[in-house]
């Protein structure tokens, strides 16, 4: 018999399965493979068909921290060139796209929008990946000059992982079903 994993109880179960021993920033990084950290992000926004993950950290970038609540999950990345928390990546049920421009998508199943607040002296803005049931917002403040490389490194580092693959992993490993 399979039991659904949902709400606070589901988050707690996945968190306890995912967090053992000492917790370092790298230990809480949601990597792009099925498992606890990614499952916790998925459960925070149960309608999201895609979940942000870190596929490979570029040279000069570090994972800072992860914050997960019901209805939202976010994490921060530090850069040796752009500073601490140079980028924030947030998963939510929806995004405010007012003033954003549709740009070429990088992920299958998602539309990408961009809104820039400043080009100089710092490159400041947000990129939005919008998909069924959710949105990932990338907020960044990057050093002008090397900003194009930093911007590309950020978007190369973060990918979108299919919720369905996570659900199958949890079902196979734990005998539990994700909500909804």
Show where each model-derived region lies.
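Residue-level signal for mature regions of secreted extracellular proteins and peptides
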Residues: 15, 25-26, 46, 88, ...
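Sec-dependent bacterial lipoprotein signal peptides
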Residues: 1-22
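Surface loops and adjacent helix of pleckstrin homology
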Residues: 27, 66, 141
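Short, solvent-exposed recognition patches
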Residues: 33-125
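A short, solvent-exposed beta-edge/loop patch
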Residues: 109-180
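Short conserved aromatic/hydrophobic patches within beta-strands of well-structured domains
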Residues: 22, 57-62, 154, 158-162
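Bacterial lipoprotein signal-peptidase II cleavage site
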Residues: 23-31
